[in-house]
Design a protein with these regions (language model features):
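Conserved Rossmann-fold cofactor-binding substructure of NAD(P)-dependent oxidoreductases
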Residues: 96-111
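Short beta-loop-alpha junction of Rossmann-like oxidoreductase domains
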Residues: 74, 126, 181-183, 221-236
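Catalytic loop of short-chain dehydrogenase/reductase
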Residues: 122-124, 129-144, 163-213, 225
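Conserved glycine-rich Rossmann-like NAD(P)H-binding loop of the short-chain dehydrogenase/reductase
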Residues: 61-76
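Conserved glycine-rich cofactor-binding loop
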Residues: 47
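Rossmann-fold cofactor-recognition segment
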Residues: 82-99
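C-terminal helical subdomain
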Residues: 213, 220, 233-280
């Protein structure tokens, strides 16, 4: 009976996700067709996981999508999406290469952006090298450069593009792991990851204050516990871990809705993908 209940909940969740996606597509297409304007989004780390699903859903909504990846030639799923959607452009980008970021911003200087989406990052998978007394300090700079400084630099370089857009959103995928309010949920072996997300949150709060005068809303997002590679699902089933996993389609659809509906008065807020405001 318990297994049946879980299946029923999953079916209902998938159904509600599809309804949300269809409504988002309808609204976006109606707005675009009203006066011929096509909204645009710039997405980092679009080759897999959350970034790929963001790309898939925005492209399905008829947006112009500029999707970046460190190795586009090896991003088969992203290339397949581009073949289906003529409005999807793929660009090579390493978010730690500031000269490359500036060059890409210059290349698209005439392209207004409705949403600048900082998604690229090093994941929070536990590692013995992030355990106190066993720390590999050489990893710290990597986490900080990719997860914190990269989004900051991209937000600064593409600020003129966002100012020229209609929706005016800077959205950044963060994590509840970077929240001091969630310190009781600490996962061992994620020290550098959590520190980088805490730094990211504070940087984006400062960005929010700096760009509010341009009517730009800054949004931080917690995607939930999404199993992008299937590993957590397998562990959850085999070890009965009781993890509350989130479907990637539901997480992304929810975050897209949060980005679209966030208000300037709440700029700098971190949201659960469901729209719930979270504490820092």
């Amino acid at each position: 009976m318990r297994g049946y209940s879980k299946q029923l909940v999953s079916v209902r969740l998938i159904a509600s996700t599809l309804v949300m996606l269809l409504s988002l597509v309808a609204v976006a297409q109606a707005e675009s067709q009203a006066d011929g304007y096509t909204p645009a989004v710039f997405i980092t780390g679009a080759n897999r996981g959350l970034g790929l699903e963001f790309t898939r859903q925005y492209a399905a909504m008829g947006w112009t999508v500029i999707a970046t990846a460190r190795n586009p030639d090896g991003a088969d799923d992203l290339q397949a999406l581009a073949a289906e959607h003529p409005g999807l452009r793929i660009e090579q980008l390493d978010v730690t290469d500031f000269e490359q970021i500036d060059a890409l911003a210059e290349k698209y200087k005439e392209q207004p952006l409705d949403v600048l989406l900082n998604n690229a990052g090093i994941s929070g998978s536990p590692s013995p090298k992030q355990l106190f007394q066993r720390l590999d300090y050489s990893l710290f700079d990597d986490y900080m450069h990719v997860n914190a400084l990269g989004p900051l630099k991209i937000s600064e370089a593409f600020l003129p593009h966002v100012r020229a857009g209609r929706l005016k959103r800077i959205a950044t995928v963060s994590s509840l792991g970077g929240s001091f309010a969630a310190r009781d949920r600490m996962a061992p072996g994620t020290m550098f990851y959590r520190a980088s997300k805490s730094a990211l949150n504070m940087l984006m709060i400062n960005v929010a204050e700096g760009v509010k005068k341009y009517d730009i809303t800054v949004v931080l997002l917690n995607p939930g516990l999404v199993d992008t590679q299937g590993v957590l699902t397998e562990m959850n089933e085999k070890m009965n871990m009781g993890l509350d996993l989130t479907l990637i389609e539901a997480s992304i659809a929810g975050m897209i809705d949060v980005i679209a509906t966030a208000e300037l008065e709440s700029t700098g807020t971190i949201y659960q993908y469901t729209g719930q405001e979270l504490e820092y």
